[in-house]
């Protein structure tokens, strides 16, 4: 039973707003152990808020259509669709939605998308992983955790001697 309760609490904290930990206050990410679901959720939310995932997506999409794996997959899908449609006998009463859904299912069941996407990932994403994405993610995580540590440590109270004495011009009035 305790495992189920723990999973539920972790699930609540993984929401976009960070959720509540049940302990009452906000969770200090720097105090969570590596791999903790709450820490992971907080980091992912931070990366999203910085726009890193959008940046990575744009970077990959800008590069994808130049890669042979994409061009090969596109050609395979085009040929598959042409062959599939050639086998259909056109009828004006034909339900186009059913035809479209049947074609979609055939493409998915063929397995060509899964294999083609895997090849695209290895040509587009994998080369960027260690040299582009990882350093940006690590930098963002370090900055996030450092900022959280600063918030968790209360600032020292101002020194009483640093207060300015009243200006003499006010006393002369």
From Swiss-Prot:
**What domain of life does the native source organism fall in?**
Eukaryota
Principal location? cytoplasm
Alphabetical keyword list: Cell cycle, Cell division, Centromere, Chromosome, Cytoplasm, Cytoskeleton, Kinetochore, Mitosis
- Where, per UniProt, does this protein localize? Cytoplasm, Cytoskeleton, Microtubule organizing center, Centrosome; Chromosome, Centromere, Kinetochore
A single Gene Ontology biological process assigned to it is: cell division
Ranges of Gly residues compositional bias? 16-25
State whether keyword Zinc applies.
no
- This protein's GO CC annotations: centrosome; cytoplasm; kinetochore
State where composition is biased (Pro residues).
154-173
Spans annotated as Disordered: 1-35, 148-173
The function of this protein is: Required for proper chromosome biorientation through the detection or correction of syntelic attachments in mitotic spindles.
Subunit info here reads: Component of the SET1B complex composed of the catalytic subunit SETD1B, WDR5, WDR82, RBBP5, ASH2L/ASH2, CXXC1/CFP1, HCFC1, DPY30 homotrimer and BOD1.
What protein family is recorded?
Belongs to the BOD1 family.
- Protein name (database record): Biorientation of chromosomes in cell division protein 1
Record the organism. Mus musculus (Mouse)
Q: Which gene encodes it?
A: Bod1
């Amino acid at each position: 039973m305790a495992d189920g309760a723990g999973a539920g609490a972790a699930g609540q904290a993984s929401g976009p707003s960070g959720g509540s930990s049940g302990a009452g206050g906000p969770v200090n990410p720097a105090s969570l152990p590596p791999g903790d679901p709450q820490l992971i959720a907080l980091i992912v939310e931070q990366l999203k808020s910085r726009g890193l995932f959008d940046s990575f997506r744009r970077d990959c999409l800008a590069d994808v259509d130049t890669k042979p794996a994409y061009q090969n997959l596109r050609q395979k899908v085009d040929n598959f669709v042409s062959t599939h449609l050639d086998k259909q006998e056109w009828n004006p009463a034909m339900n186009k939605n059913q035809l479209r859904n049947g074609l979609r299912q055939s493409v998915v069941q063929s397995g060509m998308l899964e294999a083609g996407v895997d090849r695209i990932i290895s040509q587009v994403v994998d080369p960027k992983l260690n040299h582009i994405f990882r350093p940006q993610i690590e930098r963002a995580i370090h900055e996030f955790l450092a900022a959280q540590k600063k918030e968790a440590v209360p600032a020292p109270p101002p020194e009483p001697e640093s207060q300015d004495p009243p200006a003499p011009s006010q006393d002369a009035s």
